[in-house]
Amino acid sequence: MKYLLIALVRGYQYAISPFLGRSCRYVPTCSEYMVDAVQKHGAFRGGWLGVKRVCRCHPWHPGGYDPVP
């Protein structure tokens, strides 16, 4: 499950993200954060942390440096 999630995010990074341009307000980007969170915490908790991060990534949030806990 862990490797499937990472593969899906990597697929997004290489196939879709280049056409959308840089729009993430955070460092590391939301997709990098998702991969790091899944590697560090596993599929379920890491996936949940990644989803929460994507929900916080919008124009009205200041963004900035936000590492995986």
From Swiss-Prot:
It is a peripheral membrane protein. One of its GO terms (cellular component) is plasma membrane. Its main location: membrane. It is found in: Cell inner membrane. Keywords: Cell inner membrane, Cell membrane, Membrane. It comes from the Bacteria. InterPro entries: Membr_insert_effic_factor_YidD. It holds the Pfam family YidD. Belongs to the UPF0161 family. Could be involved in insertion of integral membrane proteins into the membrane. This is Putative membrane protein insertion efficiency factor. It comes from Dechloromonas aromatica (strain RCB).
